[in-house]
Curated annotation (Swiss-Prot):
Alphabetical list of InterPro entries matching this protein: FNR_nucleotide-bd (IPR039261), MRET (IPR050415), OxRdtase_FAD/NAD-bd (IPR001433), Riboflavin_synthase-like_b-brl (IPR017938)
Chain ranges passing through the membrane: none
Species annotation: Vibrio orientalis
Protein name per Swiss-Prot or TrEMBL: NAD(P)H-flavin reductase
Record-stated family: Belongs to the Fre/LuxG FAD/NAD(P) flavoprotein oxidoreductase family.
Coiled-coil intervals: none
A GO biological process held by the record: bioluminescence
Source domain of life: Bacteria
GN (gene name): fre
Taxonomic classification: Bacteria, Pseudomonadati, Pseudomonadota, Gammaproteobacteria, Vibrionales
Length: 164
């Protein structure tokens, strides 16, 4: 019902997902609501059923005319929002430097890490920085809080267009 509605950021970009809606839902054991959403979606898919969604209510877009570098910051499944922005920028071949910082408790929470590393390898203007709070000894990324990692890497953010 109406009281069961929850917001999920859309990860799909109009450039990459024509006719599809991609959501990133953190359905961990401690998040009963997210698990229920995932189970309801699975059941609807298996039974050729329907899921009712409410249209997006946000008003976010990339300032394409800006020549400033972009700083995309996300934690956990909040990555879906910056994923959509990154996809759009890559599809539009924006030349701005793009710095994407994505943080999670541990590496397994960075579920699209290899894909982002591939994107960064293909596009010289894309810089991906994974950040984990709990790192194994062989971890090559940053450790700690994602916002602290950004703070450590930049003296000032005044010259950036920031999406968080």
């Amino acid at each position: 019902g109406e009281k069961d509605k929850r917001p999920f950021s859309i990860a799909s970009s109009p450039c990459r997902h024509e006719g599809e809606l991609e959501l990133h839902i953190g359905a961990a054991e401690q998040n009963a609501y997210a698990l229920e959403v995932v189970e309801a979606m699975k059941a609807a898919l298996e039974q050729d059923g329907e899921i009712t969604i409410d249209a997006p209510h946000g008003d976010a877009w990339v300032q394409e005319e800006s020549e400033r570098p972009l700083l995309l910051i996300a934690g956990g499944t909040g990555f879906s929002y910056v994923r959509s922005i990154l996809d759009h920028c890559v599809a539009q071949e924006l030349k701005n430097d793009i710095h994407l910082y994505w943080g999670g408790r541990d590496e397994c929470q960075l579920y699209a890490k290899s894909e982002l590393e591939e994107i960064a390898a293909k596009h010289n203007n894309v810089h991906f920085v994974p950040v984990v709070e709990e790192a194994p000894s062989e971890w090559a990324g940053k450790t700690g809080n994602v916002l602290q990692a950004v703070e450590q890497d930049f003296d000032s953010l005044a010259e950036f267009d920031i999406y968080i």
